[in-house]
Curated annotation (Swiss-Prot):
<feature type="region of interest" description="G3">
    <location>
        <begin position="512"/>
        <end position="515"/>
    </location>
</feature>
<dbReference type="Pfam" id="PF11987">
    <property type="entry name" value="IF-2"/>
</dbReference>
<dbReference type="InterPro" id="IPR000178">
    <property type="entry name" value="TF_IF2_bacterial-like"/>
</dbReference>
<dbReference type="GO" id="GO:0003924">
    <property type="term" value="F:GTPase activity"/>
</dbReference>
<dbReference type="InterPro" id="IPR000795">
    <property type="entry name" value="T_Tr_GTP-bd_dom"/>
</dbReference>
<feature type="region of interest" description="G1">
    <location>
        <begin position="466"/>
        <end position="473"/>
    </location>
</feature>
<dbReference type="InterPro" id="IPR015760">
    <property type="entry name" value="TIF_IF2"/>
</dbReference>
<dbReference type="Pfam" id="PF04760">
    <property type="entry name" value="IF2_N"/>
</dbReference>
<feature type="compositionally biased region" description="Polar residues">
    <location>
        <begin position="27"/>
        <end position="37"/>
    </location>
</feature>
<dbReference type="Pfam" id="PF03144">
    <property type="entry name" value="GTP_EFTU_D2"/>
</dbReference>
<feature type="compositionally biased region" description="Basic and acidic residues">
    <location>
        <begin position="154"/>
        <end position="225"/>
    </location>
</feature>
<dbReference type="InterPro" id="IPR004161">
    <property type="entry name" value="EFTu-like_2"/>
</dbReference>
<dbReference type="Pfam" id="PF22042">
    <property type="entry name" value="EF-G_D2"/>
</dbReference>
<feature type="binding site">
    <location>
        <begin position="466"/>
        <end position="473"/>
    </location>
    <ligand>
        <name>GTP</name>
    </ligand>
</feature>
<comment type="function">
    <text>One of the essential components for the initiation of protein synthesis. Protects formylmethionyl-tRNA from spontaneous hydrolysis and promotes its binding to the 30S ribosomal subunits. Also involved in the hydrolysis of GTP during the formation of the 70S ribosomal complex.</text>
</comment>
<feature type="compositionally biased region" description="Basic and acidic residues">
    <location>
        <begin position="318"/>
        <end position="333"/>
    </location>
</feature>
<dbReference type="InterPro" id="IPR005225">
    <property type="entry name" value="Small_GTP-bd"/>
</dbReference>
């Protein structure tokens, strides 16, 4: 087997397998090591596949550290390839560090021979070729020539590379072994240092515990001198109970300290310290004060509880805090609970206030005292957060949240709840509830009772109502002796006018209301603010729709009616017809046996005007109208407008009290300070008493017509009320828009179903009442297909912002008795926005109606022409099928619409392509004649079918 052949190629390759040293497989894991005094530390533990010596196997380590003499016996005679192998094997086992010596109580370790043999000797036979290659290598002379001849250059290079790689791996393994030994040495040194530190702390802790035990013993002896009975009980308990663990004085003949531990067994933890304050020891032999002494029974019980766990368990729980070094005996306050003394190292304890609360709670539990529940009156608004509710009840928000969780509601302290839920919570916690609302800011402003002793007679407020063009304003003009009608556009009243006249030394306040149907709301406001209603009826026109509406408003307001039959000077006047027509509406005049006063007047010729005023004064005397002029003013807004030079101007009627310049008032959602008072003749007055109409200057904004106003104490109150009303108005507007708008899907469905078109408008008027009338009139014009959408409306001139809004919404601008400024006109020209001006509401409504009619889709009208019966069907080249027909009814026109009817079922509708008679195109074929007809894009025609001819017309519609 020693002979080599040329084909034995594996001779020089196999030995290099013995040179490879596998990298030691290291697995790391982390464990938590516990030390005394409750300290823990995370330790990295490495698990290796190679078997290392443990600290308790000292003989094995020493044997492993020495080189094995038997293995390298033939090393000097081996080939150079085997030298690195033995060197690396010896080097791998050489750098094993000597472990720390085990204590003398440790058991002897096992023999070392079985440990070292598998490490080196078992690797070599695995990679050797069978047949004793190692024994034959000392004879190179016999094989040297043969070996050189059989090894090729590539094989020599492979062997050289294998040797170089083995040397590199050897160096790496040696460096890795050195680092591992260094790390283990550092780890052993650190552990030794920690053990020394732990032993030192344990010794200090034992010394401190001994000192505390001695101090406690002396304190108990001092207390026993004053209280002999508790001392006897304490002694009996001490005799019947073993000494506490590491805390009691030792018996005679027994050394101080803990219980001795058996050999080879670690100590079972440090003694548990008694939780007493350090300053309890007597200083300089002086007895402690009575306040610092504990009761003997209580101290023994506490010691039993503290030491019981140490006696029963294997190891007591270590103390968290580090021992404190006492500087001197006179340091009395050393044991005081402070932040610095209780937060040393990792320890942490309760604060002084927490300890005090705990002591108070313990005292109450011992004395069986319960904390008295304080019931409070909790003010709850309409909405409140849980945190604010807890603060008002002086309760913890956690308790409220727990209560709500029991009720099945998961809420946070910042969540908002309503008043009902807050009331339930407050009552559940034993508090009384006082509900308040945002509307409470208006309490005490309106409907304040008058002082009956200070009331005086006031002028009556008379409203003139009736149908349009029945002479209401002409009658008021005749009474005032002033030409009011000539100043109004179109001769009709556009807004309420309030005037005051004097008759026989007595004042009468008149309110003129429009008679047009669009001004229904203004008539209603006039009736609500009045004492007497004069119903004007034309003698030649009798009762009209607006007359009936005025009667209903007066009855709804509960005011008496005086009928003024006007235009008696006309030839067609019939006053008796008017009285009879009023009977149908339950208005019974005196001449017809009723109680309603009626006067025949002529505003044009000023006939019987005195009788009408006397009837008004008589009715006012029967009503006995009184008011308190010394109280704060209260009334109603008749009309409001935005004047360019004076700002917001409101025409108001004082109902109670007296209004002065400088008063702060609230009108609807607006407030302001009265800057000036102007009467109906344009004169500035210093005060306005009850039933006096005046114009107020100084409001922050333009109020709505019909709003009530009242004088308040200060600006803060006025601002609060105005903000509350503005918030209500915004909420209503949002709710109305959201309810009308809905979701996008609903809008699209509505448009698909109804196909509603909108006509957007921006309306600006002179007064708020006129804008309201225009809005109501335009709403009535709307249908299911088209309606007017008012993007914005307001009192005042047309501004540039109105033009921008109209441009954004693609709306038209309408000005009623107002004009646009220069900037607005220029902007409208640039943007292409149309601005229309109107003075009469009739014209405005007619134009908008015509524009809305243009949005309507034209109506499709169908006119029947005639029927024709198909007699024969012909196939004609380049034309298709042609029906030979006879007109049986009416006529058939070329280009008319046709329907193909088969068995009384319409199977096709289209247009007639050709209409011929004897090969000639004709315009129409009358009844009884035959013709040929062809349809557009349709050939399915049969003999016997009926053709119906009709004409379609599209007619534009109007509203």
């Amino acid at each position: 087997m020693s002979d080599k052949t040329n084909d034995d190629k594996t001779l020089s390759v196999n030995p290099k397998k013995t040179l490879t040293l596998k990298r030691p497989g290291v697995e790391q894991s982390t464990v938590r090591q516990n030390f005394s005094h409750g300290r823990t530390k995370a330790v990295v533990v490495e698990t290796k596949k190679r078997k290392f010596s443990r600290p308790d196997e000292k003989p094995e380590v020493e044997a492993a550290a020495a080189p094995k003499p038997a293995a390298p016996a033939a090393a000097p005679q081996q080939a150079p390839a085997s030298a690195p192998v033995s060197a690396s094997a010896a080097q791998a086992s050489a750098p094993q560090p000597a472990p720390v010596k085990a204590p003398a109580t440790k058991a002897p370790a096992a023999p070392s021979a079985p440990v070292t043999k598998p490490h080196v000797a078992q690797q070599r036979p695995v990679h050797q070729r069978p047949g004793g290659q190692q024994a034959q290598r000392p004879r190179p002379a016999d094989r040297s020539g043969m070996v050189l001849n059989t090894l090729s250059r590539s094989e020599m290079d492979a062997r050289r590379r294998a040797l170089e790689e083995a040397q590199i791996r050897e160096v790496e393994e040696r460096a890795r072994a050195v680092e591992e030994a260094k790390r283990r040495a550092e780890e052993d040194a650190r552990r030794a240092k920690e053990r020394e530190e732990s032993a030192r702390r344990q010794a200090e802790e034992e010394a401190r515990l001994k000192a505390e035990a001695e101090a406690r013993r002396k304190a108990e002896e001092e207390a026993a001198k004053r209280m002999p009975q508790p001392e006897a009980r304490s002694e009996r308990r001490d005799d019947a109970r073993p000494a506490p663990y590491g805390a009691r004085p030792q018996q005679a003949g027994r050394p101080q300290g803990g219980r001795p531990q058996p050999a080879g067994r670690p100590q079972q933890g440090s003694p548990r310290p008694a939780p007493i304050i350090a300053d309890a020891a007597p200083i300089a032999g002086k007895p402690l004060p009575q306040s610092q002494l504990r009761k003997p029974g209580q101290s023994d019980d506490d010691d039993d509880r503290r030491s019981g766990a140490a006696r029963r368990g294997v190891a007591a729980k270590p103390e968290v805090r580090a021992p404190k070094v006492v500087k001197g005996e006179d340091d009395r306050r050393r044991g005081k609970l402070t932040l610095t003394s209780n937060l040393e190292e990792e320890g942490r304890s309760r604060s002084l206030s927490a300890m005090r609360r705990r002591q108070e709670k313990f005292k109450r539990s011992q004395m069986q005292e319960t904390r008295e529940k304080i019931s409070r009156e909790v003010t709850i608004p309409e909405t409140i957060t849980l945190q604010e509710l807890a603060q008002r009840m002086a309760e913890r928000s956690v308790d409220i949240i727990k209560y709500l969780m029991k009720q099945g509601q998961m809420m946070k302290p910042g969540d908002v709840i309503d008043a009902d839920t807050a009331q339930l919570i407050a009552e559940e916690f034993g508090h009384t509830v006082k509900r308040v609302a945002e509307s409470d800011v208006e309490e005490g402003i309106f409907d304040v009772a008058d002082n009956e002793s200070a009331t005086v007679s006031r002028p009556p407020v008379v409203t003139i109502m009736g149908h349009v063009d029945h002479g209401k304003t002409s009658l008021l003009d005749a009474i005032r002796h002033a030409n009011v009608v000539s100043g109004e556009a179109g001769g009709i009243t556009q807004h309420i006018g309030a005037y005051q006249v004097v008759q026989n030394g007595q004042k009468i306040t008149f309110i003129d209301t429009p008679g047009h149907a669009a001004f229904t709301a203004m008539r209603a406001r006039g009736a609500q603010a009045t004492d007497i209603a004069i119903l004007v009826v034309a003698a030649d026109d009798s009762v009209m729709p607006q007359t009936i509406e005025s009667i209903n408003h007066a009855k709804a307001a509960g005011v008496p009616i005086i009928v003024a039959i006007n235009k008696i000077d006309k030839p067609a006047a019939d006053p008796q017809k008017v009285r009879t027509a009023l009977l149908q509406h339950e208005v019974f005049v005196e001449s017809m046996g009723g109680e309603v006063l009626d006067v025949e007047v002529s505003a044009k010729n000023k006939i019987n005007l005195d009788k009408l005023l006397d009837a008004v004064l008589l009715q006012a005397e029967m009503l006995d109208l009184k008011a308190d002029p010394d109280r704060t003013a209260e009334g109603v807004v008749i009309e409001a407008q935005l004047d360019r030079g004076r700002g917001s101007v409101a025409t108001v009627l004082i109902q109670k009290g007296t209004l002065h310049p400088g008063d702060i008032l609230v009108a609807g959602s607006e407030w302001g300070r009265v800057r000036a008072l102007v009467n109906d003749r344009g004169e500035h007055v210093k005060e306005a008493g009850p039933a006096m109409p005046v114009e107020i200057l100084g409001l922050q904004g333009t109020p709505q017509a019909g709003d009530r106003f009242a004088v308040v104490a200060n600006e803060a109150k006025a601002r609060e009320i105005a903000e509350y009303r503005q918030r209500l108005a915004r909420d209503k507007a949002v709710a109305r828009q959201s309810g009308a708008r809905g979701s996008l899907e609903q809008m699209m469905n509505q448009l698909q179903v109804s196909g509603t078109k909108e006509f957007p408008l921006v309306i600006k008027g002179d007064v708020q009442g006129s804008i309201e009338a225009i809005t109501n009139a335009l709403d009535k014009l709307g249908t299911d297909e088209v309606r007017a959408r008012i993007v914005h409306s307001g009192a005042g001139g047309i501004t540039e912002s109105d033009v921008s809004l109209a441009e954004a919404s693609n709306a038209a601008i309408i000005g009623f008795n107002v004009r646009a400024n220069k900037q607005a006109r220029n902007s409208a020209e640039q943007q292409g926005i149309e601005i229309r001006y109107y003075n009469i509401i009739y014209d405005l409504i007619d134009d908008v109606k015509a524009a809305m009619s243009g949005l309507l889709s034209p109506e499709r009208r169908e006119t029947f022409l005639g029927n024709a019966e198909i007699l024969e069907v012909f196939n004609i080249t380049k034309v298709g099928k042609v029906a030979g027909c006879r007109v049986t009814e009416g006529k058939v026109e070329r280009g008319a619409g046709v329907r193909l009817i088969r068995d009384n079922v319409v199977i096709h509708e289209g247009k007639l392509k050709t209409l011929k008679r004897f090969k000639d195109e004709v315009a129409e074929v009358p009844s009884g004649q035959e013709c040929g007809m062809a349809f557009e894009n349709y050939d399915d025609i049969r003999a016997g079918d009926v053709i119906e001819a009709f004409r379609v017309e599209h007619v534009s519609r109007t509203l």
